[in-house]
Amino acid sequence: MEHNGSASNAGKIHQNRLSSVTEDEDQDAALTIVTVLDRVATVVDSVQASQKRIEERHREMGNAIKSVQIDLLKLSQSHSNTGYVVNKLFEKTRKVSAHIKDVKARVEKQQVRVTKVETKQEEIMKKNKFRVVIFQEDVPCPASLSVVKDRSLPENEEEAEEVFDPPIDLSSDEEYYVEESRSARLRKSGKEHIDHIKKAFSKENMQKTRQNFDKKVSGIRTRIVTPERRERLRQSGERLRQSGERLRQSGERFKKSISNATPSKEAFKIRSLRKPKDPKAEGQEVDRGMGVDIISGSLALGPIHEFHSDGFSETEKEVTKVGYIPQEGGDPPTPEPLKVTFKPQVRVEDDESLLLELKQSS
């Protein structure tokens, strides 16, 4: 009995130990599960955060694309505005060039006049027949010349002065004190304006302005149309010209082929369908009318079959070969008239022929 009691106690102790071990293992497993769940939660959080970042980036990209589209629209508008401004500038330059041409013509005329005046002045200077005109402001012109004698001097001294100082002969050169008139002022101002215009439209200034204008125009052209695009446009124009020439040549060939393919009047033989024996048949044929009988074996249609044998179909060839088939027993019936129609047949190799189609009238 004591032995059994000790054995039962030992079994209980062993069970307690096993239960403690299993509890420890369960705790460890629970801890591992919790740690794994924490890691999974952190991973899920990181994934969600990355998704949010990606969405934000997508939004930023959409906004950037919208801004780029807006910039492109603005650029197109500015491009159209620049094109309009350039057209206006070209019109203004044309007007300015026309005005410059007019001014040049006027300046040339004025130069001719100036050269004439200079030549006249040189001739007058050579002849030495001219009058000196002195301009003085606010000084009245003396009407007469008066000589005042000094009473203090004796008569002998006066005679000596007259001997040593002879009077000046003013017959050749006469002096006039003339006020400047309005016409003279206008002439002076006109000459000054002409001098300014000559300086402004001199060769050096015109060359400089042309160079600057050419530089600006070339810059605007390169901005509007690139040289590569110009080359492409030139090549496309050449291609269009070549295609137009080809079309013109093909049209000429087509006309020539049509004119060569038209048959002559001698190629067809028109006659009555059949000569009736009875007067009744003649009356019926008169009522029915005249037709066209084209015999395949005749010499008139021989050249058509030789030159245009490809243009007929098999059925048409059979129709041309078929003659008037007599019925068994009795008189041969009057054949029905045939309709002759001509159709031009166009081929790819630019050879045209007439298609002869024979249809029996119903």
UniProtKB/Swiss-Prot annotation:
This is Caveolae-associated protein 4. Residues 100-120 form a coiled coil. The modification Phosphothreonine is found at residue 334. InterPro entries: Cavin_fam. Pfam families: PTRF_SDPR. Residues 1-24, 227-261 are annotated as: Disordered. Belongs to the CAVIN family. Modulates the morphology of formed caveolae in cardiomyocytes, but is not required for caveolar formation. Facilitates the recruitment of MAPK1/3 to caveolae within cardiomyocytes and regulates alpha-1 adrenergic receptor-induced hypertrophic responses in cardiomyocytes through MAPK1/3 activation. Contributes to proper membrane localization and stabilization of caveolin-3 (CAV3) in cardiomyocytes. Induces RHOA activation and activates NPPA transcription and myofibrillar organization through the Rho/ROCK signaling pathway. Residues 227-255 have a biased composition (Basic and acidic residues). Its main location: cytoplasm. It is found in: Cytoplasm, Myofibril, Sarcomere; Cytoplasm; Cytoplasm, Cytosol; Cell membrane, Sarcolemma. Keywords: Activator, Cell membrane, Coiled coil, Cytoplasm, Developmental protein, Differentiation, Membrane, Myogenesis, Phosphoprotein, Transcription, Transcription regulation. The modification Phosphotyrosine is found at residue 324. Component of the CAVIN complex composed of CAVIN1, CAVIN2, CAVIN3 and CAVIN4. Interacts with CAVIN1, CAV3, ADRA1A and ADRA1B. Interacts with CAVIN2; this augments the transactivation of NPPA. Interacts with MAPK1 and MAPK3. The modification Phosphoserine is found at residues 152, 171-172, 353. It comes from the Eukaryota. Expressed at much higher levels in cardiomyocytes than in non-cardiomyocytes. It comes from Rattus norvegicus. One of its GO terms (cellular component) is cytosol. PANTHER family: CAVEOLAE-ASSOCIATED PROTEIN 4, CAVIN.
